[in-house]
Regions:
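Short acidic/glycine- and proline-prone juxtamembrane loop motifs at membrane-interface regions
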Residues: 141-145
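Short helix- or helix-capping micro-motifs
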Residues: 126-131
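Membrane-interface helix-loop-helix junctions at transmembrane boundaries of multi-pass membrane enzymes
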Residues: 111, 115-116, 171-172, 210-225, ...
Length: 529
C-alpha cells in the first residue's frame, strides 16, 4: 500500500520551483548553464533539463557550495541515480522516483523502530500509519531532499532505542550500535541541515534519561562523548560551508512570526499528518466542510492518543521506549519554536519541515492509538482517502501552482506566446522554469511558437522593458506575459515595446497573482510612416 500510494501518479503534477532547483543540480548543472537574458523557444527546455555526464560528487558539491544553501549528499545520490536511467525518458517521474523509494524504505524502518521498542504488532501499526499518511506520501512525491533525511532519522531512532534498551534494560554497551548511530547521524548532516535538530534532540533525550536514572557508569558517558565527537569531526569539512549558506539571501524568505500563530500552525500541521481533505482552490462551502471534518477528526485522534500515552508511561515495560520517542519529538518541536522566536523566521508556515520529527510522531501515534477502539482503523481509513485526494492534486498543491499559471498563459492557444520573467535571483529563474515546464506539457504537440525569456531586474523593472525594446523583430500578433516578483498591479506599464516593430498594450482583465504577479500584454505591429 505504501509503495502504491507513493508511485501512483508520480508525474501527474508539474515540477515546482524547489523541484526545478533539485533537477538543475542533480543533472550535473548549475545556474550558469541556464540561458539568461535572451529569448529561447520552449522546446529548448528539453536540452536545459538534460543529463550532463562526467561530473563527480566534488563538482556537484562545489556548485552547491557557491549557488545553493544545501549540503551535497542527496544531490550526488540523485546524479548517480539519474545516470543509471540514461537516456532519460519520462524524466520527471525518474527525478521523483528515488525520493519515493526512500519514502517506501522509511515504512520498513519505522516498523523496526516500533518492533524493537514495543512489539511486532506495534511495529506493523507504525508501518501502516507511515504508509497511508498524506504528509509522508506528499513528501515522497516531491523531488526534494526530505524522504532521505526522514529515512536516516528513522534509522537513528532505531539505534537510539537500542542504546536506551542496552543501558536501562540490559546494562551493557555495544560499540557497534553506538557506531551505527553515529554514522547514520553523520550521513544525515550531509543530506539536510535540519538533521542537526534531530541529532540535538536525540542527545538531549538520552542525556535526560541518564540524569533521570542517575546513571553514573563512566563508560556510558565516555561512549556518548566519543560518539558526539566523531560526528562533529566528520561534519567539520562542511561546517564552514554551512555557516556561509546560513547568511545567503535565499534563507531570508521566511517571515517573522505573528504572535501565537506558530502554535496553531503547528497543531494544523499535526492534523495534516493524519488527514488532508480538499480546502485549496475549493468553493467556500466545500472548504468549510472539509476543514470542520479535519478538525473534528484531529480532536478525536489527539484525545485518544493522549489517553494511550498515559497508559504507556505508567507501564514499566513500555515507559522507557515511550519516553525516548516522546522526548525526541518534543525536543524537536521546542527547537522549532526556539528558531521561530529567536531568529524571527516562522518555519511552521512550511509543513514539509516537520519531516524532522515526523518519524517520532508516527511511532508514538501508532503505539498510543493501537487498541483504542475505532481510532486506529479510522486513522488508516482517512489516511487512504487523503492520499487519493493527494494523488489527484486536490490537497498539498504545489506552491505557486505552475499548472494553473500555465493554463492562464495558454488561454489563446492559436496565438504565438512569449513569457518574460524578470529575475532578481536564481529562485526567480527556477520559478519561471517551472512555469515553462508546465506550459510545455500543455503545448507538447502544438506548432504555435512559444518562447521564454529571463531578464535581470535587480536594478529596477525598467531594465526589463529596455531589453524587450532591443529584441530582434518578432512576429505579430503576439501574447506577451510578463512575470515580475515584487511588482504591484499598478506598477505594470500600460504599454511595452517588443523590438522596434511591436507595441504591446496591457490587458486590464488579464492580471493574475498566485504568489507572484503576472500580466498579459497584447502585441501588434507599430504603425510606420
Amino acid at each position: 500500500m505504501g509503495a502504491f500510494l507513493r508511485f501512483w501518479n508520480l508525474d501527474f503534477k508539474p515540477l515546482w520551483m524547489d523541484e526545478v532547483i533539485t533537477a538543475i543540480f542533480s543533472l550535473g548543472k548549475n545556474y550558469k548553464d541556464l540561458p539568461l537574458d535572451k529569448v529561447f523557444p520552449l522546446t529548448n527546455l528539453t536540452e536545459i533539463f538534460s543529463y550532463q555526464s562526467g561530473k563527480s560528487c566534488h563538482n556537484i558539491a562545489a556548485n552547491l557550495a557557491l549557488q545553493s544553501t544545501h549540503p551535497p549528499l542527496f544531490f550526488c545520490t540523485m546524479y548517480t541515480w539519474l545516470g543509471w536511467w540514461q537516456p532519460l525518458g519520462n524524466w520527471i517521474a525518474e527525478l521523483r522516483f528515488l525520493p519515493a523509494l526512500f519514502g517506501v524504505a522509511t515504512v520498513f524502518v519505522i516498523y523496526w523502530v516500533n518492533r524493537i521498542a514495543f512489539s511486532t504488532q506495534v511495529g506493523l501499526a507504525a508501518a501502516a500509519c507511515m504508509a497511508v499518511s498524506p504528509f509522508a506520501v506528499y513528501l515522497s512525491q516531491e523531488a526534494r531532499h526530505y524522504t532521505l533525511p526522514m529515512l536516516l532519522i528513522s534509522l537513528a531512532l532505531l539505534f537510539l532505542v537500542k542504546i536506551q534498551q542496552d543501558i536501562f534494560r540490559h546494562q551493557r554497551i555495544r560499540v557497534w550500535v553506538w557506531g551505527c548511530w553515529a554514522i547514520v547521524n553523520t550521513i544525515s548532516l550531509y543530506v539536510h541541515y535540519f538533521c542537526i535538530l534531530a541529532l540535538i534532540a536525540q542527545i538531549v533525550t538520552l542525556v535526560s534519561l541518564l540524569i533521570w536514572q542517575k546513571a553514573k557508569h563512566r563508560q556510558i558517558w565516555l561512549t556518548l562523548t566519543f560518539s558526539i565527537t566523531g560526528i562533529a569531526v566528520s561534519f567539520f569539512p562542511w561546517f564552514m560551508v554551512m555557516l556561509h549558506h546560513s547568511k545567503r539571501s535565499e534563507t531570508g524568505w521566511l517571515e517573522a512570526p505573528q504572535h501565537v500563530a506558530p502554535l496553531y500552525q503547528t497543531i494544523i500541521n499535526w492534523v495534516l499528518m493524519l488527514i488532508a481533505f480538499p480546502v485549496e482552490q475549493q468553493p467556500i462551502v466545500n472548504a468549510a466542510i472539509s476543514a470542520v471534518f479535519m478538525l473534528l477528526c484531529g480532536v478525536w485522534f489527539v484525545r485518544e492518543a493522549i489517553k494511550g500515552l498515559r497508559q504507556l508511561l505508567k507501564n514499566p515495560d513500555t515507559q522507557f521506549s515511550t519516553l525516548t520517542l516522546l522526548g525526541f519529538t518534543a525536543c524537536v518541536v521546542l527547537e522549532f519554536f526556539a528558531i521561530i522566536y529567536l531568529t524571527q523566521k516562522d518555519i511552521t508556515v512550511v509543513p514539509r519541515y516537520n519531516f524532522v520529527y515526523y518519524p517520532g510522531f508516527c511511532a508514538l501515534l501508532a503505539v498510543s492509538l493501537l487498541g483504542r477502539g475505532k481510532a486506529f482503523p479510522a486513522v488508516l481509513l482517512v489516511g487512504i482517502v487523503s492520499c487519493i485526494f493527494l494523488n489527484f492534486n486536490l490537497v498539498f498543491q504545489k506552491p505557486f501552482q505552475p499548472e494553473l499559471v500555465a493554463r492562464n498563459f495558454n488561454q489563446e492557444p492559436s496565438v504565438p506566446l512569449m513569457v518574460v520573467v524578470g529575475y532578481s535571483d536564481y529562485q526567480d529563474v527556477a520559478l519561471g522554469l517551472s512555469f515553462g515546464l508546465a506550459l510545455q506539457q500543455i503545448k507538447s504537440n502544438s506548432l504555435t511558437p512559444y518562447n521564454l525569456a529571463f531578464f535581470d531586474k535587480k536594478s529596477n523593472f525598467q531594465a526589463v522593458i529596455d531589453k524587450l525594446a532591443q529584441l530582434p523583430a518578432q512576429k505579430a500578433p503576439l501574447n506577451l506575459w510578463v512575470v515580475a516578483s515584487g511588482l504591484r498591479r499598478r506598477d505594470f506599464p500600460e504599454q511595452i515595446n517588443v523590438s522596434s516593430q511591436l507595441g504591446c498594450n496591457k490587458d486590464e482583465k488579464k492580471y493574475y497573482r498566485i504568489g507572484i504577479p503576472y500580466q498579459l500584454y497584447r502585441c501588434r505591429k507599430l504603425a510606420t510612416d
